[in-house]
Regions:
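HKD-type phospholipase D/PLD-like phosphodiesterase module
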Residues: 1-9, 13-138
Length: 138
């Protein structure tokens, strides 16, 4: 709801955006907002992306860029992997118009909504933050 109501900016930082139906819905919404003139920026972790079974590939990123979404990879994995494998960005933060923020443990993936059979039932949370604390997450 808050993303749909954004007027100026949507900034997202996630460990990964899994290439599935949830991220497709989100990216469609973000593209709509970008077309309305909202600044849409997203950051994801290089290891987080390549460690999931449905990573974003270059053609996905190219499509997102064409649709007005500024998406960047943090610390791309490169050989030798051990040089940067522990310097990861595991944050999950969304800031909308500098007024509302969400943070918690959820990445962008179907299984945060429907679960994952091999892990059984679990719950991950995100919290909505308003007021001065939003500036700390911006």
């Amino acid at each position: 709801k808050a993303v749909k109501q954004a007027k100026k900016s949507i900034h997202m930082e996630y460990f990964n955006f899994r290439n599935d139906s949830i991220s497709a819905l989100l990216f469609d919404l973000l593209a709509e907002k970008a077309a309305e003139g909202v600044e849409v920026r997203a950051l994801y972790d290089g290891f987080g992306n390549c460690s999931n079974d449905r990573p974003l590939k270059q053609h996905h990123l190219d499509s997102l860029h064409r649709r007005g979404i500024q998406i960047k990879e943090f610390d791309r994995l490169a050989f030798p992997f051990f040089q940067n494998s522990f310097f990861r960005d595991h944050r999950k933060v969304v800031v909308i118009d500098g007024l509302i923020a969400y943070t918690g443990g959820m990445n962008v993936a179907d299984y945060y909504v429907v679960g994952k059979p091999e892990f059984g039932a679990w719950r991950d949370l995100h919290c909505r933050i308003e007021g001065d604390a939003v500036a700390e997450l911006q």
